């Protein structure tokens, strides 16, 4: 059996031979030799490549005019009366105005975007989005036909649980999920029970052109696996329910210390409330937990949440 010194001598000899040959450069560890293809990291700094990339992006945008750019998880946080839902609804409304071909999936009743689509099973066992009244399959061509008849038309699916994150898809045209009181679905007390399929959907939003927007009274109440995937946080504040000021926090750079978030503020937003903003949704609607189980896994009953906090 080779001693540690013998392993080191063998690794050094292998290192010298492969370095001269230029094939690969090994990394020496206590367990042996890990080979790394060194040439793959040698790239010339070609400035033309940057211009070619910009040209490619312009052409892509021209060929895909309805491509859905927003992605990642955004949380509006603040206590009751802080204007977090008002701010979040305003944010979602602006996105829907900018991207009319996107699908909205939410647990909030929007005045301008009534529920008009449902998630329904297909004969092959898969789930799809269909029109609530005609039961027609909703495709991009179907959406284009409706927009040609009514430019203010938007597809809106009622959120019915975490499964919607997987079932509602819209290709490059995007899906925006707005989940009010998101901590009721994914909270810190149940972080160990989060199914891997949920995290797959949350962590791959960019590839699927999905954007999750949620609200939470306490940011730290959200499950830790979810907090690790949050890109941005909006800390909401309201003065006399008239003036709103929000801090935009970089969720990826901010750190948690002693159960508190040490924010890295990257922006601010200010605006006055208006009757139009309040008319956009039912401000007194009560949110609920949608599923007692997800993918066959039972969830903690609501009354246990407070019992386990003590």
Where are each of the predicted segments found?
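Conserved nucleotide-sensing/catalytic segment adjacent to the nucleotide-binding pocket
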Residues: 113-200
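Conserved P-loop NTPase motor module
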Residues: 7, 15-17, 26, 232, ...
